[in-house]
């Protein structure tokens, strides 16, 4: 069993973006390829949770397993994706990553996993005053909490955090760059992110 594993959530339908965000172009590749390059440099095992509509296209781009949600919970948002990844890879801790934060750095995963300890169920960053539960780490004991929520048809990350002993870390306290956490939801944000990248 790995001590740490990674789960990339690439199953959303990207309605506001207009096309699958995982496949958006970024620095000569795609969001999903860039994110996986970063994650696999730090983590031994990584799995991508994808949607049936794009699963084959994602599989052609990446060198890690690509799976869909557990059938019974398909379409139940990030909680379904996280628990599906936890079932696929056995690990003590899981670093979670959405497919729409292409600025993420391998340094972030080093910082994040360095903050884990057995007394906590989760480690969640607070960036510019906002909790980032999808750029966080979760202990494998959280799996049962997720199943319990899904059985009650509860799908909120906030509901999950309310049931966990969470270590919140302020980004500035751990030298985390706020740019790592910028997520792209619309084409306007995508254009801005590309401009910001070219200005660096």
From Swiss-Prot:
Gene Ontology MF: a single term: metal ion binding
Enzymatic class: transferase
Catalysed reactions, semicolon-separated: Mo-molybdopterin + GTP + H(+) = Mo-molybdopterin guanine dinucleotide + diphosphate
Binding site for GTP: 9-11, 21, 69, 100
GO biological process per UniProt: Mo-molybdopterin cofactor biosynthetic process
Any one of the GO CC terms: cytoplasm
Required co-factors: Mg(2+)
Keywords: Cytoplasm, GTP-binding, Magnesium, Metal-binding, Molybdenum cofactor biosynthesis, Nucleotide-binding, Transferase
Similarity comment text for this entry: Belongs to the MobA family.
Entry comment, domain topic: The N-terminal domain determines nucleotide recognition and specific binding, while the C-terminal domain determines the specific binding to the target protein.
Function: Transfers a GMP moiety from GTP to Mo-molybdopterin (Mo-MPT) cofactor (Moco or molybdenum cofactor) to form Mo-molybdopterin guanine dinucleotide (Mo-MGD) cofactor.
Protein name, entry field: Probable molybdenum cofactor guanylyltransferase
């Amino acid at each position: 069993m790995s001590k740490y594993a990674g789960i990339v959530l690439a199953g959303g339908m990207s309605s506001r973006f207009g096309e699958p965000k995982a496949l958006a172009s970024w620095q000569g590749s795609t969001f999903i390829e860039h994110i996986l390059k970063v994650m696999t440099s730090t983590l031994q095992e990584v799995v991508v949770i994808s949607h049936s509509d794009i699963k084959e296209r994602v599989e052609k781009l990446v060198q890690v397993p690509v799976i869909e949600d557990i059938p019974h919970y398909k379409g139940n948002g990030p909680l379904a994706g996280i628990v599906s990844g936890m079932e696929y890879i056995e690990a003590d801790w899981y670093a979670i990553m959405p497919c729409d934060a292409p600025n993420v750095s391998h340094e972030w995963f080093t910082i994040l996993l360095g903050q884990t300890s057995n007394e906590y169920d989760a480690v969640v960053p607070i960036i510019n005053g906002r909790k980032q539960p999808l750029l966080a780490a979760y202990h494998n004991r959280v799996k049962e909490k997720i199943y319990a929520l899904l059985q009650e048809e509860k799908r909120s990350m906030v509901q999950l955090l309310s049931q966990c002993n969470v270590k919140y870390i302020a980004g500035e306290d751990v030298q985390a760059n706020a740019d790592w956490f910028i997520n792209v939801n619309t084409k306007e944000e995508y254009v801005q992110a590309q401009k910001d990248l070219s200005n660096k």
